[in-house]
Structures are given as C-alpha cells and as structure tokens.
Swiss-Prot record:
Belongs to the GroES chaperonin family. It comes from the Bacteria. HAMAP family: CH10 (MF_00580). Pfam families: Cpn10. GO terms for molecular function: ATP binding; metal ion binding; protein folding chaperone; protein-folding chaperone binding; unfolded protein binding. GO terms for biological process: chaperone cofactor-dependent protein refolding. It comes from Methylibium petroleiphilum (strain ATCC BAA-1232 / LMG 22953 / PM1). One of its GO terms (cellular component) is cytoplasm. This is Co-chaperonin GroES. Keywords: Chaperone, Cytoplasm. InterPro entries: Chaperonin_GroES, Chaperonin_GroES_sf, Chaprnonin_Cpn10_CS, GroES-like_sf. The keyword Protein biosynthesis does not apply. Heptamer of 7 subunits arranged in a ring. Interacts with the chaperonin GroEL. CDD domains: cpn10 (cd00320).
Amino acid sequence: MKLRPLHDRVIVKRLEQETKTASGIVIPDNAAEKPDQGEVLAVGPGKRNDKGDFIALNCKVGDRVLFGKYSGQTVKVDGDELLVMREEDLFAVVEK
C-alpha cells in the first residue's frame, strides 16, 4: 500500500535507535525512548494561500528531520510504523 499525504502533511519513518550505549550497556526495547528523528517518505502539495495557490513545503522526500516525541499519528503500512504529521510539527531539517 502507498500513502499520498494531503495538504501540508508529511509521512515520516522513525530512524532506528541505538540499542547499546557508548559504554556497552544494552538498552531493552521497553526502556528505550522513541527516536525523535526520521526520514521523510512523502510530502503533500502544501497549504493553499488566499488566492488558492499551493504554498510548497520546506522539506522534501529523503530529508532527515527532527520532531517531538509525541508528534504525528502513528499508522502501520505493510508492517512498517510510519508517522503522519503536519509540516509545522517538524522542528528542523538535518543537513549533512
């Protein structure tokens, strides 16, 4: 199944979190915090302005982004957990 976000929404896949600390301690799944970074998989066309034209989003497919722990709505697609959120829920684009 493929999702196509509407309006100013983006679809993000959380990046995998490290399961081991720098000192070698293994963190169990139930104790680990959800990662707050992800990769943008799809973007909507944007919001409309007063004239009815779309205002393009500031992020694009493939961008690595930062977001809040509780941002977005979690959905399962083909066994993957994805987040659907508004662009305004994104804090930043991580530049390489």
